[in-house]
Amino acid sequence: PDRIIAADPHEDRGRQLGESYGLHFTRSNSEAAEAADVLVLSVKPQVMGKVMASIKGHLRPGSLVLSIAAGVRIKVLSDGCGHNCIVRSMPNTPGQIGQGITVWTGTSDVSDEQRQWTEDILGAMGETLYVDDEKFMDMATALNGSGPSYVFLLMEALIDAGVHLGFSRQDAQRLVQ
């Protein structure tokens, strides 16, 4: 954590993140980009354009840009960042508890060492699956991205139904799981 810089335009949120996890904090995306070996873009797709514009021209040659933004294609990332060493990834919701699977792909500029870094970073959320063609990213997003949330929602509804029928919540959970 002492080598990680979190960039957030909201100082209170960024400072809290820094204090909670022992990270360095900056409000400047360009400052983070200039210092990064690996720059993780973990923002909503609708703000990605603004974020990419703020780092364009600030990335060091050979640094890795790792995107976790849904639906943002590698060409868009490369053009927007002015950089070619790009990984696009799509984690799913169970990754929040380390039980997910993240599908990822990268450009030919990504070195073997950077591929290993990617596996290590994304592996913190569970399993990883590398695909060599970006077309599989969109397919995986449809299949895997939010799909598990619907399964959990259905499980919660079944548990509620069990409670409604007279089971304790604990017993209903055991029956459903």
Model-derived features: where do they sit?
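NAD(P)-binding Rossmann-fold cofactor-contacting core
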Residues: 1-18
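Mobile acidic interaction elements
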Residues: 6-7, 11, 25, 124, ...
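Short acidic-hydrophobic, aromatic-tinged amphipathic segments that line or gate anion-handling sites
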Residues: 24-29, 130-131
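Rossmann-like NAD(P)(H) cofactor-binding subdomain of soluble oxidoreductases
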Residues: 11-12, 21, 29-104, 108
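Internal alpha-helical scaffold of NAD(P)-dependent oxidoreductase catalytic cores
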Residues: 76-85, 101-139, 150-177
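Conserved beta-strand segments of alpha/beta enzyme cores
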Residues: 3, 22-24, 85, 127
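Small-residue helix-packing motif on alpha-helices
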Residues: 4, 14, 32, 168-175
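Aromatic-residue-lined binding/catalytic grooves and analogous aromatic/hydrophobic interfacial grooves
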Residues: 147
